[in-house]
Amino acid sequence: MAIVSKHSLDLSGIGPINAAGIDGCRAGWVVAYRDGEEINLLVISRLSDINAALAPAASVMIDMPIGLTDDNSPRICDAHARVALRPHRSSSVFGVPARKVTRCIDYPEANRLSREMSGKGISKQAFYLFPKIRELDDWLLSEERNGQWFECHPEVAFARLNGATPLAESKKTDTGSTLRKKLLFELGDVESTIQRALDTYRRKDVLADDVIDALVCLLTAERSPNKRLHIPTDAPVDARGLKMVIAAPA
C-alpha cells in the first residue's frame, strides 16, 4: 500500500492514475486508486496534493458536492438522490447551501445568512463540511487541475450495486459494513485493503467507513461512461459552469 501523510507528500513514484475515488476524512482526504491489480490508498491533506499523480483525463469520483446554487434553493440532484434512497438512507443526503453560505467561517453567520436567503437554516453537520466544499469548489476551477471530476454519493452508489435497493443497515454497524464490502467485489480483496489502511492510519485521522466510501467512489470511477448513471440526466449548471450531477454505477 502506498502511504502519504501530511508530512510526506512525495508522489513521484505514483501514477499516472487513470481512476480515483476520494472521500473526506479527519486528516484531509482518502484517495483510492488501482496500481495494476492492487488497490492502493493515500491520505492527503489537500486535493492539490494528488494532482501530479493523476492522468490528464483521469476519472475522479469524490464524495463532496460539486456545483452550488446562488439562491440557496435545493439542488435537483440532491432531491433525486433522496428519492432513490427511500426509505432507509434518504437522510444521508444533506441539503447543500448556496455558494455564498459555504463561504461563511462561523456557524451563526452561516445559519443567519441561509435563513435570510431561503427561510431555512443549516445543520452543524453540513457546516462542518464547508472547508472541504470550499476547497473542492476552488480546486475545480484551477487551470492546473488534472482529470474529469464528478460528485459521487456513496449511499446512492451502494444502492445501485444492490439492485437499486437502498441498504437498510447503517454503514456504522458491523452488518452494514459487511454488506457494503460484499458489494465491492469488483475491486477484488477489499477486506485486505481496508485492514491495511486501519493498520497504517490512526482512527483520529481515518475511519473504516471513510475507506469504504472512497472504494465505492473508485468502483464508480472505473466504470465506463455507458455503465454509469447520472442524476439527473439533464443536469443544471451553476454560475461557475459546474454541473450539479451525482454519478453512480448504472
Predicted regions and their residues:
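RNase H-like (RuvC/DEDD) metal-dependent nuclease/polynucleotide-processing core
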Residues: A2-A19, G24-A250
